[in-house]
Structure formats: structure tokens, C-alpha cells
Amino acid sequence: YISLDPIYRKFNHDNITFSFFYAFSENFVLPISHDEVVHGKCSLFNKMPGDRDQKFASVRTFLSYMMAHPGKKLNFMGTEFAQEIEWNYEQELDWCLLSDERHAQMQRFSKDLNHFYLEHAPLWEVDFSWEGFSWISNDDYTQSVIAFRRFDKEGNELMVVCNFLPVLREKYCIGAPYPGVYEEIFSSDAVIYGGSGLSNGAEIKTQDDEPMHGMEQSICLNLAPLSVVFIRCKQKKVRRKKPAAKSKTAAASKTKKTAASKTSSGAGTKTTRPRKKKAEPQA
């Protein structure tokens, strides 16, 4: 999927989503092994279509998607700094590439992504059960965007949104599980990694009157071309339940009952004084 020209990805959207549906049938390892970067298969970097900027962005997107996917990870040496030629067992890796700023940025990205993965249990603690994963959106094939949630054993979660096209998505809305404020905590498009630096910041407020994807509220994001963002809820808003409105019929009925009760009560307690008889004259 990731090696396809972006124009054809919408016709192969199931290639990027299907693995999630059987990810919990066994305990899987997700390998990009030496077999994938040898014998004419190209390095991961050169599997990517487009110019050099798009190749670097695609590698960052792929590795971020891989880290967010359920299952344990395996990457062959050289992937972390975007080795350009195939692996050759007769020679060492092209460490000289690290003198190129773009490859050095790629190495820093791989390092930071690994640390981010280890520091956030939702990405690895429940890897082999549906309890650790939930879809938000998997069917937006026309824009080649997917979004899902990952959970740890305590119920803490991260939201992951992947944009697989070299197209900027402004105000791209997805369902949000809780009302409140969300924040972007990691982006493959950060400037320090060679990206554009587009960020959603730390104040992403929910649209509580815009339900989406089976959730009562939504958030809108700006997605850089060929990028992955990790989002979390930093402040939940407690919804106050409004008291149930009483119908006019019920209110009128209650008023009638009260009036009838008062009338009945008054009729039962009213007393009549006996009339005094006039004294008759004595003979």
C-alpha cells in the first residue's frame, strides 16, 4: 500500500485496514526484516513514491502507523535513518548519510518515536485483544485517512489519525469519545524531523453539538500531507443533565387534582351554626 502512487491508494484502502481485523486472532510480530530490503526489493526509503521530501515523509508516516498498530515491532537496521540502498551483507551500512541533515532528522525521529512508544502504555500493553483497540473511522478511502483508539489496562487511551496522501486536510473532523479539551502529543510532521511543522496544539476543543462516528461529539484537526498525529484527551467536561421537562398535560392534570383536593377538603370541614329560636311571650 505505502509503495503505491498516492493516486491509486483509494482503490486499495483495504490493504491498510484489513490487518486490524485479524490482528487479535494470534500474537503477531510486525516485521520489516532483511528479506524486505534485499534482492531487488529496494530499501524502505526507495520503496516510497514521489520526490525526496515525500519519501522521507512517507517513511515517517509508515513507521508511525506501524508503532500504533497492535502487535510487536521488528525493523531491520538502516531503516531508522533511511538507508537508501539495499542491504549488502558484504559491507556496512551507509553511516556517511548521517552527515546529510535529512537523514540525521530521520534518525532523531526514529529515536523519539521509540521513546514515545515506550512511555505510552496504550500503544503496547494490550496488543493482542480487542480491549486494546477500537476504530474511529476506517472507511474514508476517498481521502485515505484512518483513525483509531488504543487503550492500556487502566483504560487510558490515545487517538491516532493517519493521512496517507500528500494532501493537506484542513478541519478534518472525527468523532471524539469524551467532551472536553484534547491535545496533540506527537506528530510525524514536526520541523525537527524534517516536516512542515503543522500542529494542532494543546487546546483542541470538542464540538459538543456535532456527533460523529457513533460518538456524541467531535474534534476537527489539520492533517499535514503524509503524516500521523497522536491525540489524547487532557480535560474531560462533565455534562450536566437537564431536569426532565414536565408536559403541559401533566401540569394541568396536577393543577386540577390540587384544586379538587382543596374543594373536597373545604367542603368536609365547613360547619353551620344553628339558628336561635325567638322567645315566645309568657302568658
Regions found by a protein language model. Give the residues of each.
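Acidic/aromatic-lined carbohydrate-recognition and catalytic surfaces
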Residues: 159, 171, 226, 281-283
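Conserved alpha/beta catalytic core and glycan-binding cleft of carbohydrate-active enzymes
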Residues: 1-82, 86, 118-174, 178-189, ...
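A generic secondary-structure boundary signal that marks alpha-helix termini
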Residues: 115-118, 122, 191, 226, ...
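Active-site rim elements
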Residues: 45-57, 94-104, 215-220
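Aromatic- and carboxylate-lined catalytic core of secreted/periplasmic carbohydrate-active enzymes
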Residues: 98-133, 230
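Intrinsically disordered, polybasic Lys/Arg-rich low-complexity tracts
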Residues: 237-283
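C-terminal accessory region downstream of the catalytic core in glycan-modifying enzymes
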Residues: 93, 98-107, 113-115, 173-207
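C-terminal beta-strand-rich structural cap/linker in extracellular carbohydrate-active enzymes
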Residues: 198-240
